[in-house]
Structures are given as C-alpha cells and as structure tokens.
Amino acid sequence: MADVPKREVENVEFVFEVMGSPGEGIDAVDLGDALRALNLNPTLALIEKLGGTKKRNEKKIKLDEFLPIYSQVKKEKEQGCYEDFIECLKLYDKEENGTMLLAELQHALLALGESLDDEQVETLFADCMDPEDDEGFIPYSQFVQRLMSDPVVFD
C-alpha cells in the first residue's frame, strides 16, 4: 500500500464500495472492470494472470489483495492510451480526414488482438458510436474518446 498514493487508495475504496460487498471484496470476475473503472486498460491475459476469473463466485478479491494488483497494472507498459488507438485507426483512414468505414472497425474488433464477439461489438457501438454517414464512414476519434471515458459493461 506504500506505493499507492492516498488519493488513489480512496478511489480504489470507492470502486470496492460500488462493485463489492462490505468486508468480502469484489468478485474476481469483476477484476478487469474494477481496474478499468480506475482508468487502467489491462489486457485480458494480464487480468487472468493477476487472478481474474471467467466465472462468478469462484473467488473474491479483498481490498488489501487488490491494491498490489492495481499498483502492478498501473506500472504495466502494455496499456493502450488514446493516442495509441488513434494511431492504429489512422491506418484505416484512407482519406486522412478522421473517418473510417464502420465495417472495417467492426472487422478489426471482431478479428484482431483481443477480439470481441458480435454481441459485445453491438453493445460497444450502441454506447459509443456516432451514426455512420451515407457512405458507411464514422468519425473514429469521438468513438475512442467515448470508449475510454465511459466503461462499457458487457453482461
């Protein structure tokens, strides 16, 4: 706890109040969501490595167990930031005007990296996407801003 500033500990405690049960901690299946609520972007592999589970009620993570995890993820270099995502999406911006085809974004989310499933992509688009224009293009910077500012919850 020594390497986590007091203000950040307060933020972590708040996330635990919202996501967990008093004294019991948070469900390990919610580890990634808790970290993302604290403005971190861990990969699914890292979440699993740090004790995240895929099924609810397998394990609980208490606050004193979570703080070292939070500290470790905060130091991770493999997190994407806004600029990283924009640079990646610029590869699809053939006109260099801040837009890309919605179909290309959908394909990238379904097939590349830590891919999402169809339902997750639909939820993501419903929560973060501007409507496409008549030619099928969307402004990708607003999409990334919304994506990074408001966590999208997948059931």
Swiss-Prot record:
Coiled coil: none
The name this protein goes by in its record: Myosin light chain alkali
Keyword Repeat: yes
InterPro entries (alphabetical): CALM/Myosin/TropC-like, EF-hand-dom_pair, EF_hand_dom
Biological process, per Gene Ontology: mesoderm development; muscle contraction; regulation of catalytic activity
Entry superkingdom: Eukaryota
PANTHER family: MYOSIN LIGHT CHAIN 1, 3, MYOSIN LIGHT CHAIN ALKALI
Ranges where the EF-hand domain occurs: 7-41, 80-115
Lineage: Eukaryota, Metazoa, Ecdysozoa, Arthropoda, Hexapoda
Record text on subunit structure and interactions: Myosin is a hexamer of 2 heavy chains and 4 light chains.
Record keywords: Motor protein, Muscle protein, Myosin, Repeat
UniProt GO MF annotations: calcium ion binding; enzyme regulator activity; myosin heavy chain binding
Organism: Drosophila melanogaster (Fruit fly)
Database matches in PROSITE patterns: EF_HAND_2 (PS50222)
One Pfam family of this chain: EF-hand_7
Gene Ontology terms: cellular component: cytosol; muscle myosin complex
Tissue occurrence: Indirect flight muscle isoform is found only in the indirect flight muscles. The larval and adult isoform is present in the larval and adult musculature.
UniProt key word Repeat: yes
